[in-house]
């Protein structure tokens, strides 16, 4: 059970350690920090680099973490005026007698596991302890380089920029002990329906890491477009991408994986199949059944264009063999997982499949079992742990390898049903953690019956999932105590029918932070109660400001009237929050 925090309140401000640590205590002494602070890593002095073997992943992770810490403190910090009463003189004075951080000691208690750059869930101890003395000594202790990364991340959240110059913390002394509730804390990003430039993908990874989230689920292909280059099958992207400049090269994929590995974020690629695969038609039309049926596409697919890989085709099997033989070895050095998709398989589409000609589950289920068995065997041969969407297990009742991770999305019951069958589960109920909901329909409707039926044109998962709703979601809801170990964590999802690079940041941040805290800290407090919005809101407001300082166009949480009149416990000078009911 996670412990409560002991907050050191100062002025009307708040120390926004996000996500919430296991234990945290602070004081009200001021410490300044400058670029020349001495840093040691297990005794090896250097301000930014040079730790351990030059090419080791441990060295890369620690070096990058230190450089990122300095960049955050001195280039991407915030002046916290929004968190103090209006027109107040809240900034400390910098004088010749001001106390500075004198040293930062990073102590790793043991060697990193061999798979630190592509960890199997739970194999990396992500815990850390942080101590910052009022006399200026800072010590961060962790069993792994990732723990040190997270400790340094929390360290940056203790400091603010002064409008007069300099960087300070008003919180010394500080003591933190911390570790995650769940080992899988992810975001699913769809790059098929709208393309996301590499700069946006890097920014997503950076923001995930800053929130101590550790998985980027890359939904790389879908019905609408195939932007992923496969060198042995060049026409897939040459014909399946929206445009020649909207493709991901093998070098892009590797670079994204490497960037994630240095920040503790494992990139997990998904090729959705057999459904959601219509974009293959543009290069291999003979492999796709029920392609772009009009006008009644909705009889054959969840959204246009309809189409599915044929289910009983040797040509499809050959295609998948070649695809995986090309892709999997390139992914393997930097991930232990591969997502095979499997959601929203439409039985009616197979009435138009010349290798099946049926929508009967009695016919389709054994064919789908055979289809998935082949995919699973190829993943096993390549050394991957498979993921699938819940429909493969719960709707089609497929027999899956025991190490398969089942990604749920339809209900809390889906999580409970998955673990009841003995499988690992990822939570992510669309009624709580779908970030794209609430924008209204993206389909157009003909005048008359169609328009009247769908008026006022809400989308299927409206309303928008406010951060407070996301924060209330418990991944363990309905799961028996003796099966909670099978819930590895979860993901929040940004599908992209109406999300492109212009609004991507707004759609994801800071609401994904709420999911991140649930996954790191747990949905319940030490007393077993739902965590309070009142105490979370000031911290989330500050995290939003820190994301903006990092170049993320995150949506506002509250107006300054609210943030200027609250404290770390959500109250004001008279004990009552100003913006609460």
Each language-model region and where it sits:
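Flexible, acidic glycine-rich loops studded with aromatic residues
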Residues: 386, 391-394, 398-404, 408-581
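Loop/turn elements at helix/coil->beta-strand transitions in domains of secreted/extracellular proteins
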Residues: 211-216, 261-266, 333-336, 381-385, ...
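Acidic, contiguous N-terminal accessory segments
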Residues: 12-183, 380, 386-393, 400, ...
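Feature activates predominantly on carbohydrate-active enzymes
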Residues: 115-339, 491-498
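Structural recognition of the beta-strand scaffold that forms the well-ordered cores
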Residues: 31-33, 37-41, 185-188, 217-219, ...
């Amino acid at each position: 059970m996670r412990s409560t925090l002991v907050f050191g309140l100062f002025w009307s401000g708040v120390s926004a350690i996000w996500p919430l640590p296991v234990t945290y205590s602070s004081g009200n002494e001021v410490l300044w920090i400058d670029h020349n602070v001495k840093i040691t890593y297990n005794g090896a002095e250097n301000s930014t680099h040079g730790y351990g073997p030059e090419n080791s992943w441990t060295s890369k992770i620690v070096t990058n973490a230190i450089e990122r810490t300095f960049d955050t403190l001195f280039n991407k910090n915030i002046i916290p005026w929004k968190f103090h009463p209006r027109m107040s003189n809240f900034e400390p004075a910098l004088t010749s007698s001001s106390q500075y951080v004198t040293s930062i000691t990073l102590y790793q208690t043991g060697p990193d596991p061999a798979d630190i750059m592509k960890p199997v869930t739970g194999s990396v101890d992500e815990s850390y302890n942080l101590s910052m003395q009022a006399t200026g000594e800072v010590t961060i202790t962790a069993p792994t380089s990732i723990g040190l990364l997270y400790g340094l991340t929390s360290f940056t959240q203790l400091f603010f920029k002064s409008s007069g110059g300099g960087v300070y913390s008003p919180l010394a002394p500080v003591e933190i002990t911390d570790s995650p509730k769940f080992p899988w804390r992810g975001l699913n990003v769809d790059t098929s329906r709208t393309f996301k430039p590499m700069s946006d993908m890097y920014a997503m990874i950076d923001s995930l890491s800053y929130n101590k989230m550790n998985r980027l689920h890359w939904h790389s292909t879908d019905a609408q477009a195939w932007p992923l280059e496969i060198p042995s099958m060049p026409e897939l992207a040459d014909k399946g991408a929206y445009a020649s400049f909207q493709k991901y090269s093998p070098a892009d994929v590797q670079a994204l994986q490497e960037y994630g590995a240095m920040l503790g974020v494992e990139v997990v690629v998904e090729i959705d199949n057999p459904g959601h695969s219509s974009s293959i038609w543009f290069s291999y039309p003979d492999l796709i059944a029920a392609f772009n049926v009009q006008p009644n596409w909705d009889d054959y697919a969840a959204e246009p264009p309809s189409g599915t890989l044929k289910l009983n085709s040797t040509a499809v099997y050959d295609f998948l063999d070649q695809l995986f033989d090309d892709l999997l070895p390139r992914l393997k050095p930097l991930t232990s997982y591969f997502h095979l998709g499997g959601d929203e398989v439409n039985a009616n589409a197979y009435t138009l499949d010349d290798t099946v000609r049926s929508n009967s589950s009695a016919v389709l289920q054994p064919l789908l079992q055979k289809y998935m068995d082949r995919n699973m065997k190829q993943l096993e041969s390549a050394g991957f742990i498979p993921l699938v969407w819940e429909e493969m297990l719960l709707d089609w009742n497929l027999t899956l390898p025991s190490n398969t991770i089942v990604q749920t999305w339809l209900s809390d019951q889906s999580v409970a049903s998955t673990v009841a069958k003995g499988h690992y589960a990822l939570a992510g109920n669309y009624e709580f953690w779908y970030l794209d909901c609430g924008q209204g329909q993206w389909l157009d409707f003909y005048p008359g019956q169609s328009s009247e039926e769908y008026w006022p044109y809400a989308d299927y998962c409206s309303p928008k999932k406010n951060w407070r709703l996301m924060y209330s979601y418990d991944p363990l809801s309905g799961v028996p105590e003796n099966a909670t170990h099978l819930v590895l964590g979860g993901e929040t999802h940004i599908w992209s029918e109406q999300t492109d690079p212009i609004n991507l940041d707004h759609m994801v941040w800071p609401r994904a932070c709420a999911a991140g805290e649930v996954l790191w800290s747990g949905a319940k407090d030490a007393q077993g109660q739902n965590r309070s919005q009142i105490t979370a809101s000031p911290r989330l407001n500050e995290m939003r400001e820190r994301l903006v300082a990092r170049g993320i166009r995150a949506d506002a949480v509250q107006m300054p009237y609210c943030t200027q009149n609250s404290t770390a416990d959500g109250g004001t000078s008279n004990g009552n929050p100003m913006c609460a009911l």
